[in-house]
C-alpha cells in the first residue's frame, strides 16, 4: 500500500475529513516520526509496534559490478518491531486463508 492509497482508504472509511486533511495528518505524523528517529529516540505505538535504530558495524562489502572490495562505514538503520496485537492479527488473517 502506498501513501496515497492509505490516504484514499482512510477518507473512504471515515468520511469526515477531506483527503487534504488526511494527507496533511499523515505527512505530519511521518515527519515527526522521522525527526524523532533522527535524534536517536525510540517510538512506541502500543498494540502496533515500536521503531528504533539499530547499529550496523563497519564491514567490507563487494561491488557487484566489478567484484572489488569496498569498505563500508558503520551506520544506524531504522528497525520496526511489531507489537503482540499486530502479530496476532496478522497470524489470525493468515489462518483464515489470507
UniProtKB/Swiss-Prot annotation:
Gene Ontology terms describing biological process: DNA recombination; regulation of DNA-templated transcription; regulation of translation
Sample GO molecular function, one term: structural constituent of chromatin
Record InterPro entries: Hist_DNA-bd (IPR000119), Histone-like_DNA-bd_CS (IPR020816), IHF-like_DNA-bd_dom_sf (IPR010992), IHF_beta (IPR005685)
Tree of life domain: Bacteria
Record bears the keyword Transcription: yes
Coiled-coil ranges (or none): none
UniProt keyword annotations, A-Z: DNA recombination, DNA-binding, Transcription, Transcription regulation, Translation regulation
GO CC annotations on file: chromosome; cytosol
SUPFAM superfamilies listed in its UniProt record: IHF-like DNA-binding proteins
Summary of subunit composition and partner proteins: Heterodimer of an alpha and a beta chain.
Family: Belongs to the bacterial histone-like protein family.
Protein role: This protein is one of the two subunits of integration host factor, a specific DNA-binding protein that functions in genetic recombination as well as in transcriptional and translational control.
Family annotation (PANTHER family): DNA-BINDING PROTEIN HU, INTEGRATION HOST FACTOR SUBUNIT BETA
Name of the protein in its database record: Integration host factor subunit beta
Organism field: Pseudomonas syringae pv. tomato (strain ATCC BAA-871 / DC3000)
Amino acid at each position: 500500500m502506498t501513501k496515497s492509497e492509505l490516504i484514499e482508504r482512510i477518507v473512504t472509511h471515515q468520511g469526515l475529513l477531506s483527503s487534504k486533511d488526511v494527507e496533511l495528518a499523515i505527512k505530519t505524523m511521518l515527519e515527526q516520526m522521522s525527526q524523532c528517529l533522527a535524534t536517536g529516540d525510540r517510538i512506541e505505538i502500543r498494540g502496533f509496534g515500536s521503531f528504533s535504530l539499530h547499529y550496523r558495524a563497519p564491514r567490507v562489502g563487494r561491488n557487484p559490478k566489478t567484484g572489488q572490495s569496498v569498505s563500508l562505514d558503520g551506520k544506524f538503520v531504522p528497525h520496526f518491531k511489531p507489537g503482540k496485537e499486530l502479530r496476532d492479527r496478522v497470524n489470525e488473517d493468515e489462518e483464515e486463508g489470507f
